[in-house]
């Protein structure tokens, strides 16, 4: 635990990106660990991530920091769509950081854990950036996107990379040739635990992610299983 040297009851802000549910779910074991070590946790989440974490931690205080709203394209490559959304993303990051400063002062925040929210760094407060995508994949703009990615990551005190450095499950996503200045691999994290259960279903699909791609993928999955017998 990065804040282990702090006294108990220090106030930690945990803020996952609302881009599917993966960012929120992988913050759950981190929040549980903070609570176990007697930290005071405050959560900032939006959309589906808010509803998931509110159900998981109904007793925890939530604060609102409007996040980046990236749109997935229906027809164009994601890299092209992302390029045209850069001004909107940068403006949203600016407002994230401006709002954060007010929240840090109002709630006396001692530490920040940001899961892929680029604007949640602070000069006077220790801040952690969580990611497994150091090298965002793009056919056309890989180097430019990585420079922007690292520009913001290096503003944080430390960058937690959610992967095992040796096993490297995420491949080039989490272990590119060039790494940010403040990276630290923290291994694999999940809120799920292994347990033996009676098999009820033959197939199980777990879908998440931003729209409209999530629904498009759901339609593909449903179409592909039509010929499978019970």
What are the functions of these language-model segments?
Residues 39, 124-126, 156-157, 181:
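A short helix->loop->beta-strand "cap" motif at the edges of active sites that frequently abuts
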Residues 78-119:
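Conserved nucleotide-sugar donor-binding subdomain of glycosyltransferases
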Residues 41-47, 158-164, 230:
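Short internal beta-strands
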Residues 26, 33, 192, 203-230:
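Conserved catalytic-core segment of nucleotide-activated headgroup transferases in glycan assembly
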Residues 131, 136-143, 147-213:
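A nucleotide-sugar donor-handling region in carbohydrate enzymes
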Residues 9-11, 17-18, 36-37, 41-86:
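Conserved nucleotide-sugar phosphate-binding/catalytic loop shared by glycosyltransferases and other
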Residues 45-51, 112-119, 190-191:
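Short, polar loop motifs at secondary-structure junctions
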Residues 11, 110-111, 158, 202:
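Structural motif
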């Amino acid at each position: 635990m990065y804040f282990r040297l702090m006294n108990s009851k220090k106030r930690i802000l945990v803020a996952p990106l609302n881009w599917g549910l993966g960012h929120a779910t992988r913050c759950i074991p981190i929040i549980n660990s903070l609570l176990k070590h007697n930290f005071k946790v405050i959560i900032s989440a939006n959309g589906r991530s808010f509803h998931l974490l509110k159900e998981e931690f109904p007793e925890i205080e939530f604060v609102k920091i409007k996040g980046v709203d990236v749109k997935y394209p229906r027809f164009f490559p994601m890299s092209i769509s992302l390029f045209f959304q850069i001004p909107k993303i940068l403006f949203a990051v600016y407002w994230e950081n401006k709002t954060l400063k007010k929240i840090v002062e109002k709630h006396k925040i001692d530490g920040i854990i940001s899961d892929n929210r680029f604007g949640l760094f602070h000069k006077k407060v220790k801040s952690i950036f969580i990611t497994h995508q150091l090298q965002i994949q793009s056919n056309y703009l890989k180097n430019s996107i990585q420079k922007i990615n690292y520009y913001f990551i290096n503003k944080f005190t430390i960058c937690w990379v959610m992967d095992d450095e040796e096993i490297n499950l995420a491949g080039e996503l989490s272990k590119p040739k060039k790494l940010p200045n403040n990276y630290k691999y923290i291994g694999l994290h999940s809120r799920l635990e292994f347990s033996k259960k009676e098999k009820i279903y033959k197939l199980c699909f777990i879908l998440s992610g931003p729209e409209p791609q999530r629904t498009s993928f759901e339609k593909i999955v449903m179409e592909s299983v039509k010929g499978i017998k019970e």
